[in-house]
Regions:
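Acidic, Ala/Val/Gly-enriched low-complexity intrinsically disordered segments
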Residues: 3, 7, 17-19
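C-terminal binding/interaction regions
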Residues: 171-195
Length: 215
């Protein structure tokens, strides 16, 4: 890294630390308790934990704040179970959780990323955090499904080539829009194979929590 790059990083870290002193990021324990308070569905909890793992992996890759990125992933669908009607312009996902996050003075980068991941709201994905959340969100669901259909039901046995094969099979997890998600990955600026491998490896690290550590 050049001297200029180091200076810019220090300035960015100093700015972010100042922002964090004003805003309040919950601890992981607090965020996890909030998840259990709001979400009863085991599958949705697992999805949110999977996205958390992927976001932490990307934060590490980019030398960003792993707590901020991880908790953004963990909390991004907090109100979905209670308010799944996205056409409800008052309370529909993610409007209720955004009000909660603002009321609790959560960091603006977390709030903006959660808002931007609901593309129908029209909020542009601008930061790396925003773009990573979009690129990781639905891919974790496809990878989770890849583990579910394995005889051993173990995500640690899933390989990149298997995920790529299922990605091409549009009947598999048909609700996932491949074209839209490829756009998100391209916006993040990471090669497809590298992106899938990073998310897959991150999810393997939380196999037990995801319920895909083998029968």
């Amino acid at each position: 890294m050049t001297a200029t790059g180091r200076v810019l990083r220090c300035l960015r870290q100093s700015y972010f630390e100042n922002e964090r002193s004003i805003m309040t990021l919950p601890t992981r324990e607090e965020a996890y308790a909030l998840l259990h308070e709001w979400v009863e569905s085991e599958s949705l909890r697992r999805h949110m934990i999977a996205v958390e793992a992927a976001m932490r992996a990307y934060a590490h890759h980019y030398n960003e704040d792993e707590e901020l990125w991880g908790l953004t992933g963990l909390l991004h669908d907090l109100d979905y179970e209670r308010h799944p009607d996205m056409d409800d312009t008052e309370n529909g996902h993610p409007r209720t959780e955004l009000r909660l996050f603002r009321a609790r003075n959560y960091p603006e980068p977390l709030i903006h990323a959660v808002e931007a991941h609901a593309t129908f709201l029209g909020v542009p994905a601008e930061s790396l955090l925003d773009k990573a959340l979009l690129a990781c969100d639905e891919l974790t669901g496809l990878i989770q499904a890849c583990a579910y259909v394995r005889p051993d039901r173990d995500i640690r046995s899933v390989e990149l080539k298997s995920v790529k094969k299922k990605w091409k099979d549009k009947a598999f997890t048909a609700a996932i829009d491949r074209q839209e998600n490829m756009h998100f990955i391209e916006a993040l600026g990471v090669p497809f194979d590298e992106h899938v491998q990073r998310v897959l490896d991150a999810m393997k690290g939380v196999a037990v929590e995801l319920g895909v550590a083998g029968e």
